[in-house]
Amino acid sequence: MSRYRGPRFKKIRRLGALPGLTSKRPTVGSELRNQSRSTKKSQYRIRLEEKQKLRFHYGLTERQLLKYVRIAGKAKGSTGQVLLQLLEMRLDNILFRLGMASTIPQARQLVNHRHVFVNGHIVDIPSYRCKPQDIITAKDNKKSKTLIQNSLESAPREELPTHLTLQPFQYKGLVNQIIDSKWVGLKINELLVVEYYSRQT
């Protein structure tokens, strides 16, 4: 299944806020309708929608998400927590959380078009897994800096997660540590996602 490229508001109306996909928020009316419908949903539907929230927020294909679930399942610790850490430490998501891109699709475009350095080297793979002490900077040219500056200026004034440090005037971000689960940028029950895939096999 390919990455979703359709109407974004349609997805947030059904699944709730997906800040990685779009800065738009569902209306109060649609949230109330979703709450009233939730009492009628089957357990399968609930697990499916949690999985879809994760996939659309992080901009993944079905195959990519399944791959992350399998990697998380082989790691030590809670599969759900490890899954969220893997997704949050992707380069495209780090750029988004720093405010250097307005959405994850925009961050992916910055990376694909080679506007971003990691530790002084161009990285053009959005799924690159960032690690503690990685330094992320804009390419040293006017176009790259302008694109990132526009995002920084339009980013909502939210508290930066503790695993990241931003130096906006230098177009630079630092990864301090692996993300703590309480700072994950999406309201999600990750255990339902793991359950969804465990029942597919």
From Swiss-Prot:
Keywords: Chloroplast, Plastid, Ribonucleoprotein, Ribosomal protein, RNA-binding, rRNA-binding. It is found in: Plastid, Chloroplast. PROSITE patterns: RIBOSOMAL_S4, S4. One of its GO terms (cellular component) is chloroplast. It holds the Pfam family S4. InterPro entries: Ribosomal_uS4, Ribosomal_uS4_bac-type, Ribosomal_uS4_CS, Ribosomal_uS4_N, S4_RNA-bd, S4_RNA-bd_sf. Residues 89-150 form the S4 RNA-binding domain. GO terms for biological process: ribosomal small subunit biogenesis; translation. Residues 20-44 are annotated as: Disordered. It comes from the Eukaryota. One of its GO terms (molecular function) is rRNA binding. One of the primary rRNA binding proteins, it binds directly to 16S rRNA where it nucleates assembly of the body of the 30S subunit. With S5 and S12 plays an important role in translational accuracy. PANTHER family: 30S 40S RIBOSOMAL PROTEIN, SMALL RIBOSOMAL SUBUNIT PROTEIN US4M. Belongs to the universal ribosomal protein uS4 family. Part of the 30S ribosomal subunit. Contacts protein S5. The interaction surface between S4 and S5 is involved in control of translational fidelity. This is Small ribosomal subunit protein uS4c.
